[in-house]
């Protein structure tokens, strides 16, 4: 069993980073998400650890490039990659994920420590309610 991480208060610039305006055309990306019909359902619809529904291959390589460049610069990482366990398990990445208000509560985004070192979330909410943080 892996050693659990000790809790330390998250600090911007060490444990997390914020990139405003990450997408050149967020409205276009939102329209792409809304047009998708190939959704995979998670909790509570299916026995998955993740809530809501997902569609794979969300952003194009051109849309991902500036985000990945920011991550590499901010973290000092020379490369970004998708890991696989010896058993063949992997993470989904570059997904649209829609989560309804009754499908989950507020919580941080986390991924398996066996498979990933960095995780990112791009919020696409065209008219977020006041004080929602998106």
Describe each model-derived feature in a short phrase.
Residues 1-134:
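Fe(II)/2-oxoglutarate oxygenase catalytic core
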């Amino acid at each position: 069993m892996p050693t659990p991480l000790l809790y330390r208060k998250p600090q911007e610039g060490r444990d997390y980073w914020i990139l405003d305006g990450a997408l050149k055309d967020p409205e276009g990306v939102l329209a792409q998400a809304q047009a998708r019909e190939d959704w995979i359902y998670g909790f509570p619809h299916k026995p998955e650890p993740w809530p809501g529904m997902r569609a794979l291959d969300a952003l194009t390589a051109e849309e991902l490039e500036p985000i990945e460049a920011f991550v590499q610069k901010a973290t000092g990482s020379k490369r970004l990659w998708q890991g696989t366990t010896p058993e063949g398990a992997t993470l989904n990445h570059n997904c649209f994920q829609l989560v309804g208000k009754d499908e989950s509560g507020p919580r941080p985004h986390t991924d398996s420590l066996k498979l990933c070192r960095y995780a990112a979330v791009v919020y696409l909410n065209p008219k977020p309610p006041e004080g929602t943080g998106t």
